[in-house]
Amino acid sequence: KVLEHIVDTVLQFEGDRHNMYRILRSIKNRFGSTAELGIYEMRGDGLRPVDNPSELLLTQGGGQLSGIAIAAAIEGIRPFLIETQALVSTAAYGTPQRSATGFDLRRLNMLLAVLEKRVGFKLAQKDVFLNIAGGLRVTDPAIDLSVIAAVLSSNVDTAIEHNICMAGEVGLSGEIRPVARIGQRISEAAKLGFSSILIPEGNLKGLETPKASIEIIPVNRVEAALRCLF
């Protein structure tokens, strides 16, 4: 900590040794914003920058699978689409397990409580495992909606259409709250060929019509979002 006060910039290198991707975050920057993020790929000749991380972080082909939802996220200053994976199964060993990789476990528990209380899905006796594909650690609250969608997709064993993505923060009463920089998220989804994106209804005000052809589906409650997906 003493050294951090002396230097102008502190960078943090993230990523486990079993994953090919590494993330470079700015923790301290005396001369600019700390909202910076770089994604690199480990190759045989060393680290190389990833110009379009969205294409690498999404499953290519292989058919539609349950328990997968695509989130339009923003980390640092760049938007990209990430794959949220969930597995829900009946607890076989007493106390149900809750596990999250790349996502805050306390927030996952909060979202599961919202599903129980506000939507009526009984998950108290289910094991729930959540994973953010690519080894990323995401803090953007806009992926709340995709987490809920992935969990319910796995619970009912029904796949979500592969050309739909979503962005929205989920509140304790089950409302879908507006998120920042929604225009960038929509543009990124359109660029990658998605036909529809679910966004908070509160983000419609002042939203410019995207140049690319993509259907914008506004939702204000978790229940409304689920009706659009299943």
Q: Which positions does each model-derived feature cover?
A:
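Peripheral, non-AAA+ core regions of ATP-driven protein-machinery
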Residues: 1-230
